[in-house]
Amino acid sequence: MKNGIVIVVLLLIGFSTRAQVKAEQMAPEISLPGVQDTIIHLSSLKGKVVLLDFWASWCAPCRASIPGVIKLYNKYKGQGFEVFGVSIDSKKSDWIKAIAQDKIKYTQVFDKAGWYSKTAVKYGVDAIPNTFLLDKTGKIVAIDLDEEQLENKIKTLLN
């Protein structure tokens, strides 16, 4: 009986987690509406080093990380670095308000399906903030680095 319970629990755990993309994989395409409702494609940034940042307006750790992301964006944007923010807010108005409050100038897209969006599932996002660093070819080279590690990796990829 105990073995049966253990097997059921392991199966449930296996089915409840998402398979996250891994470093060295090509980043799956993302095509979502931006602030002006035009569709923006992640692939449009090929040729640049890209920080893909999954976040939401209601996520305190996400909002706390934004000043550091803005600092990196402002420092390296002229050298071929871009940020592609993906909001999983359920209300567009909350997302727009957060962009204004935090003075975000980098590319932002909105996926109103939230946690259950195809994009979040494709990337295995089950907690936010969740970041993926892409090289100039669109390959994922790092996931969820701290700010210092991220800056060092960006510098390496830009040189």
Per-region residue spans from a language model:
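Short loop/turn microsegments at loop-to-beta-strand junctions
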Residues: 27-28, 50, 128-129
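Bacterial Sec-dependent N-terminal signal peptides
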Residues: 1-23
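Structural microenvironment flanking redox-active thiols in thiol-disulfide oxidoreductases
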Residues: 64-102, 115-120
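Short active-site neighborhood of thiol/selenol oxidoreductases, capturing the structured segment around
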Residues: 42-59
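Thiol-/selenol-based redox modules, centered on thioredoxin-like
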Residues: 130-159
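N-terminal "domain-start" segment that seeds a small globular fold
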Residues: 17-44
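Short, internal strand/loop/helix patches
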Residues: 96-132, 136-137
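Short beta-strand segments
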Residues: 53, 83-87, 109
